[in-house]
Amino acid sequence: MPDRHVLGRRARASGRRAERATLWLMWLMGWDPVAENLKLGRFELDLLMTRGDELRALEVKSRRPGAWTTADTALTYEQRRRLQMALRSYLDQVPWPGRVTFQRVSFAGWRCRFHPPERWDGLKIPR
């Protein structure tokens, strides 16, 4: 069995492939990229995309097929809180006059699922 460093490298590579695939799929659906792996202090946003007056933050989760925790359930309350804070930090720096939404994208191998978008304030996470 590979050691944990090899497994970690494979997981990061899988995550990068999933993020790149998401970026291309969103672009094919008419979205324009704003930022990729945007670091805001200790927080990070995987993808920021725009279409018309809408800004969408995307969190991409990738798991190997048959993993114990699926990519669909991989977003914990703490992770959602960090994403909310990252998005707030971005909007403090770059005010956005239009709608702001959040969307999870899950990959298991090359199977992809786009979860329904949520209003960013709909995450209901206190400051």
Residue ranges and their predicted role:
Residues 1-36:
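Acidic-basic catalytic patches of nuclease active cores, encompassing PD-(D/E)XK
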Residues 2-5, 62-111:
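Catalytic cores of nucleic-acid endonucleases
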Residues 26, 45-70, 83:
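Conserved catalytic cores of phosphodiester-cleaving nucleases, focusing on short active-site segments
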Residues 28, 41, 50, 105, ...:
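Positively charged, solvent-exposed patches that mediate nucleic-acid binding
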Residues 33-35, 57, 102:
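Hydrophobic residues on conserved beta-strands that form the core of alpha/beta folds
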Residues 38-40, 96:
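Short polar/acidic secondary-structure junctions
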Residues 40-43, 110:
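Short acidic/glycine-enriched loop/turn segments that link adjacent beta-strands
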Residues 106-127:
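Short, low-complexity, polybasic intrinsically disordered segments
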